[in-house]
A protein has these predicted regions:
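A membrane-periplasm/extracellular boundary helix in multi-pass inner-membrane enzymes
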Residues: 215, 235-285, 299-307, 315
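Alpha-helical transmembrane segments of multi-pass inner-membrane proteins
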Residues: 20-23, 106-108, 121-155, 165-237, ...
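Transmembrane alpha-helices of multi-pass inner-membrane enzymes
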Residues: 16, 39-45, 183, 225-229, ...
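Aromatic-anchored transmembrane helix interface
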Residues: 65-66, 85-113, 124-128, 133, ...
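Transmembrane signal-anchor hairpin modules in multi-pass inner-membrane enzymes, especially those
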Residues: 1-92, 113-123, 127, 185-199, ...
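Membrane-embedded alpha-helical segments of multi-pass membrane proteins
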Residues: 28-50, 95-109, 170-181, 221-229, ...
Length: 437
């Protein structure tokens, strides 16, 4: 155990490398993500165990403890139901999954400590984001031109996944990591700001936009536009680029939409589905047999939630309660997905009203301590540009009116708790010094 954290350059470099590898691990897949998370947690506990234990516990930390404790309680409650009714051959399956999910509580405290104590140099994370997202974008271009990417992966009918093969998540990846690239020069290489940034920004934006459009993930593309718009509105240094941004987006999208039938069909299909959802919702025609697939997945949460209104059905049990229990209850086959494709609806069905209230309270506090304090008060956060991309990517990630993957999967949970840990670490006292290089 080391008593001093200020004279450990090798250890600082080690943790900086692990954090810089996060964008790379998301390309490599869940196995590498889990390995990286494991190394961050175990290394932090082995090296800084006593210091982490002594970290000042704030109110938000207590809410995180309560949230994870409630996950365990919900799992235990549901597993007892499964065992007494002889439903699952594997005893306490939900409880085991819930204990494994506890790794994200350890990840939060480990990362928060490393950020708060300035052990990690985030510059290399930003550099990694730049090169990783450029690689994904260029690989998508290659796949679009030659019919397969550099690894030999071929695209689906309407989407180009690049290095992700049959996982259609390239657009989501670019949304999550490419925005950090825009802040690399303004934050870490300020002396080059006036010389190359005006050329650097439009070039990157065009590359990432084309990559997003070809990837075919419509919701990530919309959230990308939404996030960039928020950045230009709230971030003073970017406000003057709003019309440049809008012009570039309009031209790039219009050209690709007009001259590429695959992209046109993909976005036309999305527009058609959204229009149907609006009409069905407005007319309250929820029994319509022609409901879009996404609407059916969203709407499937309601009857499932009614089965366990207050404490939920336990994490990753949505399919069981939606499909098996409702089929038994109604006598009709109920076909369901593994989750309702929305973080909030998933938490509501799997952790009930109590779990959702805890999650919403945590989100509101984080937004207050970061977004509100930076842009609506005289807090010292006003001068901290390092926190800016993390704030708006957090808003994008937890935006309520959008389709999502499962909250409890490796990919989504790792990203979300990483963003949260960095945000809270950066807001702590005496942690507002940025790299002046």
């Amino acid at each position: 155990m080391f008593s001093s954290i200020n004279r450990l350059p090798l250890i600082q470099n080690y943790f900086t490398l692990l954090i810089a590898l996060i964008p790379v691990s998301f390309i490599a897949g869940n196995l590498v993500i889990n390995l990286n998370v494991f190394l961050i947690i175990v290394s932090s506990l082995l090296i800084f165990g006593r210091e982490i234990v002594k970290i000042k516990i704030i109110f938000l930390d207590k809410l995180f403890f309560l949230f994870f404790l409630f996950i365990i309680f919900s799992a235990l409650h549901n597993d007892i139901y499964f065992i007494t009714n002889d439903l699952f051959p594997e005893d306490f399956k939900t409880l085991k999954k819930s204990f494994l999910f506890l790794r994200y509580l350890f990840l939060y405290f480990s990362l928060r400590f490393l950020i708060e104590k300035k052990i990690i140099n985030l510059k290399f994370f930003f550099i990694s984001c730049l090169f990783s997202t450029l690689f994904v974008s260029l690989d998508i271009f290659y796949q679009f031109i030659f019919g397969k990417d550099i690894f030999g992966f071929v695209p689906t009918t309407r989407k180009f996944s690049g290095p992700f093969n049959d996982e259609l998540i390239a657009g989501g990846y670019l949304l999550r990591f490419s925005i950090f690239s825009f802040f690399l020069i303004p934050i870490f290489y300020r002396k080059y700001y006036n010389k190359i940034f005006l050329y650097f920004l439009p070039m990157l934006l065009i590359i990432f936009l084309i990559g997003m459009i070809l990837a075919g993930n419509r919701m990530p593309f919309i959230m990308y536009m939404f996030t960039l718009s928020l950045l230009t509105v709230f971030h003073q240094n970017l406000r003057k680029y709003f019309f440049i941004l809008a012009t570039v987006v309009l031209i790039v999208f219009s050209l690709i939409y007009k001259f590429n039938s695959i992209v046109k069909d993909n976005f036309d299909n999305f527009y058609s589905q959204v229009s149907k959802i609006i009409v069905i919702t407005y007319n309250k025609d929820f029994q319509n047999n022609n409901q879009p697939t996404y609407f059916k997945e969203f709407y499937s949460f309601y009857d499932t939630w009614l089965l366990n209104k207050y404490i939920g059905g336990g994490i990753k049990n949505f399919w069981y309660y939606c499909h098996v229990e409702q089929t038994k209850k109604t006598g009709k086959l109920k076909v369901c997905n593994t989750h309702p494709h929305n973080y909030y609806l998933e938490i509501l069905t799997e952790l009930g009203l109590i779990g959702l209230i805890l999650a919403l309270t945590i989100i509101i506090i984080i937004l207050y301590q970061t977004f509100y304090k930076k842009y609506f008060t005289s807090s010292s956060l006003k001068n901290n540009n390092l926190i800016t991309p993390f704030i708006f990517l957090f808003i994008s990630e937890i935006f309520p009116i959008k389709g999502t993957g499962s909250f409890f999967t490796t990919n989504n949970a790792t990203y979300l708790f990483f963003i949260i840990a960095v945000l809270i670490g950066l807001t702590r006292k005496n942690n507002f010094i940025e790299n002046k290089k």
